[in-house]
Every structure is written in C-alpha cells, then in structure tokens.
C-alpha cells in the first residue's frame, strides 16, 4: 500500500500550474479529510477504495477537467458552493463584481437582481453580506436554478431566491435598486475556448454572437 506522501509525490499533472494543490485537494476529498491532515500524517496509508477513488479523479484532472467539476464544489467569496458541469465555475475574478456591488449601495432594505445566476455565486455572496437586501437570481437553464436553490438552502440564506427566466423575460416589469450580471462575453470561434478548463465549461454560458457583445447589449438596452 502507498502512503499519503507517496501518492502525492507520484501524482503527475504536467499541464496544471497548480499541480501539487490539485493533487492535495483530490486526495483530501478522497480521504474525507482536510489538506492539513495530509501534512500531519504523510506516512498513513489510505484504504484501497480511497486510493482507487483518488486515482480515478487524478486521471480526470490529467485530461484537463477542472478540480471543481471533479469534486462538485468550489469556494467563492466566503462560501462553499456546489457546482456542476451545466454552470460556470465561480472564479476569484468575479468576486470583484461582489465588492463593487457592496460599495455602491448601503445595507438598507432593497431588491437586487442577478441575471444569469448560474450556481448562485454572486447572488448568494451579496445575500450573505447584506441581510437586509432581497436578492433574486434568474437563469434560463432550469438545472442551474435548481443548483442555485440547493446552495441557498444549504447556506440558509432566506433573503435570496431563484427562478427561471431568460434575462428579463419572466420578471414582468419588476424594478430593482441594482442589477448585477456576468453574461456570456466570448465570440463564437474564439481560440481561447479550446484551452484549459474552458473546454469543460458550458458553451452557452461563455459564447454569444455579435463578437461577444449581444447579451451585454440586450441587458443594457
């Protein structure tokens, strides 16, 4: 049987700039432990089933699949979110949108809208920081709405809600103090789409016509 240290040393991820971190996250999850456990007990030997699970996950990562999709979880802001292949992986860059939104408006009762909510990352981060806000998230993909609602329930954020809508279509003239969105912004055929994690993410959440500006124009106009 291989030890934790041996499994990590032999975990090869040549195309990942975060190879060691990726391997530690996968092994810790396979063991049902924290990363600190790996460093505290490097000599311990995982059970055969745990080692097999780790090997399978490592093989998927070697093919380029993001760790977030393999584990079904991703950290965003101060939240731990469930993610799935039909939604984008919440990115650290998107936290800037949350920061700006929090700076724009005070913590007084108001309605806020997140267009194209995906996993609910932006809406839930805002709801967690501003308990007096009522934050509504919409997405045209019902599976994404269901995922966002599961995240909301697990985080116990009663001031957030999610419903299906293609942008404003199902909102029937509702008005909001603030609208946030991270819409598709990449033009079809962009070479960027065939590299890295984007190969595994939903094209409909990334690609739009008009050289990547059609949805942005539709939201603004």
Can you annotate each of these PLM segments?
Residues 5, 9, 52-56, 95-99, ...:
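Generic alpha-helical structural signal
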Residues 92-192:
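Conserved SAM/SAH cofactor-binding pocket of Class I
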Residues 3, 19-23, 50-53, 215:
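Residue-level detector of well-ordered alpha-helical segments, enriched
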Residues 1-20:
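Non-catalytic nucleic-acid substrate-recognition regions in nucleic-acid-modifying enzymes
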């Amino acid at each position: 049987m291989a030890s934790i240290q041996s499994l990590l040393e032999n975990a090869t991820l040549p195309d990942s700039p975060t190879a060691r971190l990726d391997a530690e996250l996968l092994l810790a999850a396979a063991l049902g432990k924290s990363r600190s456990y790996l460093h505290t007990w490097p000599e311990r030997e995982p059970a055969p089933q745990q080692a097999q699970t780790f090997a399978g996950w490592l093989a998927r990562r070697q093919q380029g699949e993001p760790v977030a999709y393999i584990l079904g979880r991703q950290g965003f802001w101060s939240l731990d979110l469930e993610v799935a292949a039909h939604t984008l992986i919440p990115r650290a860059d998107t936290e800037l949108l949350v920061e700006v939104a929090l700076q724009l408006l005070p913590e007084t009762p108001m309605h806020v809208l997140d267009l194209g909510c995906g996993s609910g990352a932006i809406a839930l981060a805002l709801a967690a920081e501003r308990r007096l806000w009522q934050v509504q998230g919409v997405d045209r993909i019902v599976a994404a709405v269901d995922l966002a609602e599961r995240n909301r329930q697990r985080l116990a954020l009663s001031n957030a809600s999610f419903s299906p809508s293609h942008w404003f279509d199902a909102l029937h003239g509702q008005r909001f103090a603030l609208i946030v969105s991270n819409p598709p912004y990449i033009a079809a055929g962009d070479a960027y789409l065939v590299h890295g994690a984007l190969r595994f993410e939903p094209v409909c959440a990334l690609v739009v016509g008009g050289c990547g500006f059609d949805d942005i124009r539709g939201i603004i106009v």
